């Protein structure tokens, strides 16, 4: 179960991602399991609409902007670059919080 704090963050994350070249995003890790602490970061697995046009500066800027919006450290992991050894754990924990063109995400 997502904590009230994480539930309150999701609409802000969704609004931000809608302005960026992100196709879909999943919350994973301690926040998706309801086990976060005040020191926990927010782990996001994202798929970009056109990843070959995003520079490291673009991605770094997205991280900084998200951190300002939600007041927490953010780890932004590209789905295509997720290492195979981590895939099973991430897939087990992940909760879809954004998909381009969808107006309601459960």
Language-model region placement:
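Catalytic core of pol beta-like nucleotidyltransferases
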Residues: 1-26, 32-38, 49-106
């Amino acid at each position: 179960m997502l904590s009230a704090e994480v539930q309150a963050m999701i609409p802000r994350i969704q609004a931000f991602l809608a302005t960026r070249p992100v196709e879909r995003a999943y919350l994973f890790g301690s926040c998706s399991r309801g086990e976060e602490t005040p020191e926990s970061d927010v782990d996001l697995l994202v798929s970009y609409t056109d990843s070959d046009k995003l520079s490291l500066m673009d991605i770094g800027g997205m991280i900084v902007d998200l951190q300002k919006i939600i007041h927490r450290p953010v780890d932004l992991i590209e789905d295509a670059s997720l290492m195979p050894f981590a895939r099973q754990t991430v897939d087990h924990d992940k909760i879809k919080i954004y998909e381009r063109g969808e107006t309601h995400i459960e």
